[in-house]
Amino acid sequence: MRKYETIYILQPDLSEDDIKVVADKVQDVITSYKGDFQRLEDWGIRKLAYPINKCARGRYLYLRYDGGREMIAELERRLRLDEKVLRFQSVNITNQPEKPVVEKKPVPVEAEAVESAEAVAAPAETVSE
C-alpha cells in the first residue's frame, strides 16, 4: 500500500452536516477499497488565490491515508462529481520522510516580564548641545 495525502476545498457556506457528509463519503471510499484511513484535519475557511465558481473563500480539508491506485481513481472521481467540492489534489507521499510534529513550547510569563522590564529600565542617552 502507498501513502497518500489529499487536500480538498469545499464551498465556504456549507453547514457542518454537509461537511460531515462529504468527509464520510471520502472515508467510505477508503474503507471500501481496504485502505487505511489515518487522519482528517479541518483547516478552516481561507481566502482563495483566485475565485472558483464565484467563491472567494473555501473550507480546506486535509486527508492522510494508505491505499492503492484503484482507490485513488475512485476517490478523485467522486470528488470531481460532488458539486460541494471546489478543488482537490492527491499526492503520493510514500517516499517522503515523516516529519515529526513539533509543538511550540510556551515562553514562561516571568521570562517575558523580565525582558520587557529590562527594555523599559534601560536609560536612554541624552544628547546635549
UniProtKB/Swiss-Prot annotation:
One of the GO biological process terms: translation
Gene: rpsF
Pfam families noted in UniProt: Ribosomal_S6
Disulfide bridge partners, by residue number: none
Gene3D superfamilies: 3.30.70.60
GO cellular component: cytosolic small ribosomal subunit
Coiled coil regions in record: none
Descriptive protein name: Small ribosomal subunit protein bS6
InterPro entries per the UniProt record, alphabetical: Ribosomal_bS6 (IPR000529), Ribosomal_bS6_sf (IPR035980), Ribosomal_S6_plastid/chlpt (IPR020814), Transl_elong_EF1B/ribsomal_bS6 (IPR014717)
Described purpose of this protein according to its UniProt entry: Binds together with bS18 to 16S ribosomal RNA.
Matching SUPFAM superfamilies: Ribosomal protein S6
The keyword Translocase is assigned to this record: no
Family that this chain belongs to: Belongs to the bacterial ribosomal protein bS6 family.
Gene Ontology molecular function, alphabetical: small ribosomal subunit rRNA binding; structural constituent of ribosome
Keyword Manganese assigned: no
Alphabetized UniProt keyword annotations: Ribonucleoprotein, Ribosomal protein, RNA-binding, rRNA-binding
